[in-house]
Each structure stands twice: as C-alpha cells, then as structure tokens.
C-alpha cells in the first residue's frame, strides 16, 4: 500500500519505514514472520540461520485463541515449524501488524484506522466471510451458505466438505479488538524488558 507499483526498486524500498534492527521486540516479529513463511524444508537453512533461543519463550497475545503454541519450536526446521491452521496464521498476522505499529511509533487506534480505511476488502471479509470452526479451520463458503439458511440446525453432513467436518460453533473474530489486545500486550512486554535491563 505504501508503494502501489508493479515493481519496487531499491530507491522506493529505501524510503519505506522499517523497524530498528536492534529493537527488543524484533525476535517476536521474526518468529511470527518465519512461522508464516517457512512452510517447507526448502526454508530449513533460513529457519536455522534466523532462529533465536528467545523464540521458545514467546507466546500468543490471545493464548486461548490459537491452536498451536507459538514458542513450541526448535533450532531445526520440522514439519511442525510452520503455522498451518487458519486461526493461527490469522493471529500471527494480527500480531505482526501490532508489533510493527508499535515499533514504528504508530498507536493502536491509528493502526485500526489504517485497517478500516486502506484495507476495506479485508475488513469486509473479516466481518462477513471469514468464519473459523471449533478447531481453527477456515470454513468454506459452501458450508457457510447452508449455515446462513439453517443456522445452528446445520447437519453434520452439511458441515462436511472434502475430508473435513467443520465443527460448530463457527466464529468470526474482531481484528481491531485483537490488534488492540496484541498492541497493549506487546507494550507491556516491552516495558517489562525495559525494567529488567
């Protein structure tokens, strides 16, 4: 959004804001980014090179939401390293947004304003299209169409798509609230680090 072009060249890249490389929250940002992107063993070397022992003590800002413990990783990439459940991937994205905002001096309210005004399509999907089942999987549209007609009376057969049965209840999540929660928690963690030094 900062540079809406088909190609971003070095001069444009150099003007983009970036967090300080020595910021105390950088390992938290790196962990979430790596777990979103290191999807196959082709990324094993990158994972090993970037691994920080502090990853193992990191945790989600909304711990009861995610299905995968964030800090349950080691220095060697395994098939368990990447975040695969939709709700975990969503939470990582929310926390990355909050971390970068905090690191760049953007308030939580400003972050939410950017989300509403610059990412209107995502805002709409978050409120109307992205439903997660009881196991954190994104529910397909064909299942949601039946649910909209039948509500909680939807049958098990109607909740089954491909090889997955999507278990009730289905949830949407409030990205703005989650970004605020993440932001406040990362502020608290940053202040705690400052008093521990």
What do these predicted regions represent?
Residues 1-197:
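S-adenosyl-L-methionine
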